[in-house]
């Protein structure tokens, strides 16, 4: 005998929003880049795009506003490129305690595994793609995913069940 599974009030709304979220998250590389996110290049940025967008050993970071606070509307990609116009609300959506941008910050930098000596260099991936700005483009798209996810979650009715 199967256990009793209560039905959710507003099930069709949950199903519809769930489909939209699944499509959004599975196809995150195809969503439009968030329109307000812009690139600012420093005055000494190289003309060569491979050098301008090069990812180094230093992690990307949100600039500090003081001792503890960070400016989540800006992301220092490297010494030459800063992304601006990121809605602070994009930090409101998190996966395992981190926003998608925080996952990018943590994963996309050159690092060497201490045990094996293997170098993980995201620039190799960029060269394979033939797009030096692929990570910048990904960041813009992840802002769209974060913002749209939050918009969809707000539309869900309170979770209630009935028999």
Can you describe what each PLM-predicted range is?
Residues 1-163:
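Sequence-level detector for compositionally biased, low-complexity segments
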């Amino acid at each position: 005998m199967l256990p009793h599974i209560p039905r959710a009030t507003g099930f069709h709304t949950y199903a519809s929003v769930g489909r939209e979220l699944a499509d959004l998250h599975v196809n995150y590389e195809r969503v439009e880049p968030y329109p307000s996110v812009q690139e600012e290049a420093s005055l000494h940025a190289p003309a060569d795009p491979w050098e301008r967008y090069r990812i180094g050993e230093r992690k990307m970071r949100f600039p500090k506003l003081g001792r503890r606070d960070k400016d989540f509307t800006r992301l220092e990609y490297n010494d030459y490129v800063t992304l601006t116009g990121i809605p602070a609300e994009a930090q409101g959506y998190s996966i395992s305690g981190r926003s998608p941008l925080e996952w990018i910050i943590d994963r996309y930098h050159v690092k060497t595994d201490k045990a094996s000596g293997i170098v993980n260099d995201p620039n190799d991936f960029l060269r394979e793609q033939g797009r030096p700005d692929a990570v910048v483009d990904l960041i813009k798209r992840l802002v769209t995913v974060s913002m749209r996810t939050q918009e969809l979650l707000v539309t869900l009715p309170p979770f209630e069940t009935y028999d």
